């Protein structure tokens, strides 16, 4: 028989990690603004007309929406300070918090597909050097709609009764089905394992193809290929690390190779590590993309140049 647990949401809240949430919201807001600026530049600046930037647009859009959703599905649900905000949202849009909670799983899939797409783009630049740019530039919006559809489909297999948040008699309550929740966690541990293997294999294939191409092109094209490959590999490496961490947490639930006291540390570190994939892309671009670095550091360089005797 299924175990149904009904708990007022405020009983699960505490002020224990309030400082961490505030810090995450601070750097998250700054990074989202940075990502919005990059989105604008990629869409309208001719300097970023290459098709790879269309894939980066998809990544940025996904990560912006994921970060916004995490406020309501994770961060605000941990602290009493934000309870009035959650109550207002649920009263205004009934079912909003339950949808937001399921959104965590939607973005789990979508972030994987967009990270994988960066590798697929790099491979297609070698296998179809003539037509790949036109294809990605022309169809990237339709491609993103398809990725969203697949992610929604994968998320829809979750039973609705596993976890939901409702307003009852003026109180927010969390309703969870223990057996269904365990099943969901097991399914996503399998997803994490499969996605990790896929990303690793595609990454290796991407390195193989790009290394062959680099030897056959001009110096200028070689620099561009290496830059885009570095961006793809670093981003893929970070995302693989998040998947591996999720797999380790799933294994720990069964084998308990870490003390129970580590549970709190695990959960807190998962939130921080999740930010690595959600918020890291603009900084990876700033490090490895000379065009972006010049654009944002131009004013600083000019000031420095004036001080040279």
UniProtKB/Swiss-Prot annotation:
GO-annotated cellular components: cilium; membrane
Principal location listed in the UniProt entry: membrane
Superkingdom, natural source: Eukaryota
TM helices/strands, residue ranges: 22-42, 140-160, 190-210, 230-250, 272-292
UniProt-listed InterPro entries: 7TM_GPCR_serpentine_rcpt_Srg, NRL-Serpentine_Class_Gamma
Keywords from the named record: Membrane, Transmembrane, Transmembrane helix
Protein name: Serpentine receptor class gamma-47
Native organism: Caenorhabditis elegans
Native organism taxonomy: Eukaryota, Metazoa, Ecdysozoa, Nematoda, Chromadorea
């Amino acid at each position: 028989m299924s175990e149904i647990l009904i708990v007022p949401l405020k009983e699960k809240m505490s002020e224990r990690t309030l400082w961490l949430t505030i810090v995450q919201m601070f750097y998250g807001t700054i990074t989202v603004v940075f990502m919005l600026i990059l989105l604008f530049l990629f869409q309208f600046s001719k300097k970023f007309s290459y098709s790879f930037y269309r894939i980066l647009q998809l990544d940025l859009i996904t990560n912006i929406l994921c970060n916004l959703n995490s406020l309501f599905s994770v961060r605000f649900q941990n602290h009493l300070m934000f309870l009035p905000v959650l109550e207002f949202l649920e009263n205004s849009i009934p079912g909003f918090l339950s949808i937001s909670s399921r959104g965590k799983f939607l973005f789990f899939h979508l972030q994987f597909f967009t990270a994988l797409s960066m590798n697929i783009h790099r491979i297609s630049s070698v296998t179809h050097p003539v037509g790949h740019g036109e294809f990605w530039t022309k169809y990237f919006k339709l491609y993103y709609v398809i990725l969203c559809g697949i992610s929604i489909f994968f998320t829809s297999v979750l039973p609705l009764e596993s976890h939901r948040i409702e307003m009852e008699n003026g109180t927010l309550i969390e309703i969870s089905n223990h057996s269904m929740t365990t099943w969901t966690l097991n399914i996503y541990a399998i997803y994490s394992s499969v996605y990790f293997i896929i990303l690793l294999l595609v990454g290796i294939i991407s390195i193989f193809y790009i290394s062959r191409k680099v030897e056959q092109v001009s110096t200028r094209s070689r620099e561009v290929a290496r830059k885009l490959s570095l961006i793809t590999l670093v981003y893929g490496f970070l995302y693989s690390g998040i998947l591996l961490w999720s797999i380790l947490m799933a294994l720990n639930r069964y084998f308990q190779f870490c003390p129970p006291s580590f549970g709190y540390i695990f959960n807190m570190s998962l939130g921080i590590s999740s930010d690595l994939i959600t918020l890291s892309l603009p900084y990876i671009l700033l490090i490895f993309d000379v065009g972006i670095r010049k654009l944002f550091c131009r004013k600083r360089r000019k000031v420095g140049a004036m001080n040279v005797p």
